[in-house]
C-alpha cells in the first residue's frame, strides 16, 4: 500500500464531517485543522486539545496517521516562556493521541520561522518527542540553515520545495526522510522510498477556497503515481 500523500493540516473548510472525509482520501490521513472554526495554531494552543475535528477523527482506526502541533520555537517567538510552551504543546499532543488508534503516528511540529528563532530547538523538540511513541518530524515553510535539521533527532523534515533546494546542503539527508511540499512535480529533486508529498504549506489561508481541496489532492495523487509507479 502506497504511503506518500498527506497534508500539512489546515483546510479552508468549516464542516467537520467533510474535512475528516477529505483527510481519509489521502495515503496517510492527517488530523484536519479548520481555522474558520478557531483551529489556527496560535488559537488552539490557548485551549490545548480544542480542535474541531478531533472527536470525529478519533472514530477511525489508522494504519498510519499524521498529526501536528505548533512547535516550541514558534511559541517562544510569540512571547511564551520555554516551560509554558512545552507544557501547552504536550497537553495538546496528549489530548490528540489519547484514544487515537494507529499503528504508526507521525507527529510534525509546525515551526514556520524556525530559522529566525535563535533558540536551541533540538533540545526543545527532544523534550517533546521523547514523551510520545511517534515518528518525529518538523514542518518549516520558511528558509533556514537546513544542516541544523539534518543534524537533529528528527526522522522527517517537511519543507517548501517550491521555494527552497535543500539538496545542496552538505549534511543533506543524513538518514532523514523528506516531506516534499510541492506545487508541481519539478519541485522534487530527490524523492526516495519513505519520503512524503504535501502542499508547500497548509490551506488555511484566505488564498484557498473549498474547491481547492479536491484540486490539490488530485494533483498530489497524480504526482505520487508518476514518481512511484503506484
PLM regions and their residue ranges:
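Active-site-proximal loop/short-helix segments
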Residues: 68-77, 104-123
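Conserved, mostly hydrophobic/aromatic
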Residues: 67, 89, 93, 111, ...
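N-terminal active-site wall of soluble small-molecule enzyme domains
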Residues: 118-150
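Short, amphipathic alpha-helical segments
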Residues: 83, 87-91, 119
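Alpha/beta catalytic barrel-like cores
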Residues: 1-85, 134, 148-195, 205-230
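Secondary-structure boundary elements
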Residues: 88-107, 127-137, 226-230
Amino acid at each position: 500500500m502506497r504511503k506518500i500523500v498527506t497534508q500539512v493540516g489546515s483546510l479552508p473548510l468549516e464542516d467537520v464531517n467533510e474535512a475528516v472525509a477529505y483527510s481519509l482520501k489521502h495515503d496517510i490521513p492527517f488530523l484536519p485543522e479548520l481555522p474558520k472554526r478557531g483551529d489556527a495554531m496560535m488559537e488552539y494552543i490557548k485551549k490545548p486539545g480544542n480542535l474541531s475535528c478531533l472527536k470525529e477523527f478519533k472514530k477511525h482506526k489508522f494504519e498510519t496517521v499524521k498529526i501536528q502541533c505548533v512547535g516550541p520555537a514558534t511559541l517562544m517567538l510569540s512571547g511564551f516562556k520555554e516551560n509554558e510552551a512545552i507544557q501547552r504543546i504536550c497537553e495538546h499532543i496528549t489530548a490528540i493521541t489519547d484514544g487515537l488508534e494507529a499503528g504508526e503516528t507521525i507527529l510534525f511540529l509546525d515551526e514556520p520561522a524556525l530559522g529566525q528563532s535563535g533558540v536551541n530547538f533540538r533540545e526543545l523538540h527532544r523534550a517533546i518527542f521523547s514523551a510520545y511513541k511517534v515518528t518525529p518530524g518538523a514542518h518549516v515553510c520558511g528558509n533556514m540553515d537546513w544542516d541544523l535539521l539534518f543534524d537533529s533527532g528528527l526522522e522527517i523534515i517537511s519543507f517548501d520545495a517550491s521555494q527552497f533546494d535543500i539538496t545542496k546542503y552538505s549534511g543533506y539527508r543524513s538518514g532523514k526522510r523528506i516531506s516534499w511540499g510541492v506545487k508541481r512535480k519539478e519541485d522534487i529533486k530527490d524523492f526516495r522510498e519513505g519520503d512524503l508529498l504535501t502542499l508547500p504549506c497548509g490551506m488555511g489561508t484566505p488564498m484557498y477556497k473549498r474547491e481547492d481541496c479536491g484540486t490539490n489532492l488530485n494533483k498530489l495523487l497524480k504526482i505520487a503515481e508518476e514518481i512511484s509507479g503506484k
